[in-house]
Amino acid sequence: SLNFTYFSTLFNKRTIYSSSVIVEGSDQHFERVKGMLTGVMVLKGTAKTKMTVGLAVNIDPTAQVPVIPVFTYEHRFDNGLIADVTLPKSVYMRKYLFKNTGRVSLGAEMDQTTFYVYNIDGSNPDQRFQYRQLDINSGIIYEHAIGDFIITGKTGIKLTPSGRLFRKEDNFNDAVFEITPDP
């Protein structure tokens, strides 16, 4: 990807604009170019509390939601706990350990898995498909700094509320195969 960030002031508040051009593909083919534009305004920035609000614009013909509101909030409590909220991505409670070389986090985050599939039925070997699924990962994360490296361990539950296979040139809503959780 290629990224650009610009810092400015809007309504007397620090505002950060960023853009990204992302090239996507697989080990077999280049597949698509997509982009992301964001604008985030810092509403509060103190030693204990940081809060921002903004918009993210997804420039991708297969995007499920082209415009996404963004809200971040971080607060450091007196007991060492940190509330770390990045909506719509994640919600965590964090705590530094061992003289700030370790950190434990409890919470949840949304993630996406995507990959390309080729020659599914053999009738059209040039037809390309994209599989995309939404994952919600809930659990505990431990991170530990050793020199210049950070070792991470995760445990918890992964929920996949939706997954779809669609032709590369089609929209995410035009799925040829769909998975949903079975309650």
Task: Tell me the role of every PLM-derived stretch.
Residues 3, 16-22, 52-56, 72, ...:
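Transmembrane beta-strands of outer-membrane beta-barrel proteins
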Residues 11-17, 47-51, 79-81, 100-104, ...:
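Outer-envelope beta-barrel architecture signal
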Residues 7-9, 22-30, 44, 56-62, ...:
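Sequence/structural signature of outer-membrane beta-barrel proteins
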Residues 1-18, 22-27, 139:
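Transmembrane beta-barrel domains of Gram-negative outer membranes and organellar outer membranes
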Residues 70, 87-173:
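Outer-membrane beta-barrel translocator/channel fold
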Residues 2-8, 37-45, 55-57, 71-75, ...:
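Residues on the lipid-exposed face of transmembrane beta-strands in outer-membrane beta-barrel proteins
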Residues 7, 25-29, 41, 59-61, ...:
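Outer-membrane beta-barrel proteins
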Residues 1, 31-35, 65-69, 87-89, ...:
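Residues that define the transmembrane beta-barrel architecture of outer-membrane proteins
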